[in-house]
């Protein structure tokens, strides 16, 4: 039975799902704004928020290695610890905002923007 199992399968294997969310997390850290489907956006929040909290609470070599093990991208780990952790030092969670936008043209899937709150806006 499927009682109280968290997360969605997205019709993918567990390795594919893990790789998809790793790639999405790296893209979100790099660009600070991405567009994806609404269910993926909701599950991405469960991946990225603990990473930011962990980076914020302890900037050690072990914490950086754990982040690198999950992201596999040196630039993303550097930005996570150098820019994002200090930015959210005073914020107790809620680092990600999900904004519903339109529906995808091909299959009418609900789309959403995922952005990091308090991000600098280009003028």
From Swiss-Prot:
SUPFAM superfamilies: Prokaryotic ribosomal protein L17. One of its GO terms (cellular component) is cytosolic large ribosomal subunit. PANTHER family: LARGE RIBOSOMAL SUBUNIT PROTEIN BL17M (PTHR14413:SF16), RIBOSOMAL PROTEIN L17 (PTHR14413). Part of the 50S ribosomal subunit. Contacts protein L32. NCBIfam families: L17. This is Large ribosomal subunit protein bL17. Gene3D superfamilies: Ribosomal protein L17 (3.90.1030.10). One of its GO terms (molecular function) is structural constituent of ribosome. Pfam families: Ribosomal_L17 (PF01196). It comes from Dichelobacter nodosus (strain VCS1703A). GO terms for biological process: translation. Signal peptide: none annotated. InterPro entries: Ribosomal_bL17 (IPR000456), Ribosomal_bL17_CS (IPR047859), Ribosomal_bL17_sf (IPR036373). PROSITE patterns: RIBOSOMAL_L17. It comes from the Bacteria. Belongs to the bacterial ribosomal protein bL17 family. Keywords: Ribonucleoprotein, Ribosomal protein.
């Amino acid at each position: 039975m499927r009682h109280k199992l968290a997360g969605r399968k997205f019709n993918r294997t567990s390795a594919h799902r893990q790789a998809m969310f790793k790639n999405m997390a790296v893209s979100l850290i790099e660009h600070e704004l991405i567009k994806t489907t609404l269910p993926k956006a909701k599950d991405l929040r469960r991946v990225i928020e603990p990473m930011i909290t962990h980076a914020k609470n302890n900037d050690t070599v072990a914490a950086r290695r754990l982040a690198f093990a999950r992201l596999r991208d040196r630039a993303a780990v550097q930005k996570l610890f150098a820019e994002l952790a200090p930015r959210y030092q005073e914020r107790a969670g809620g680092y990600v905002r999900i904004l519903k936008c339109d529906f995808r043209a091909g299959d009418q899937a609900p789309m959403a923007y995922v952005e990091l709150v308090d991000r600098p806006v280009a003028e």
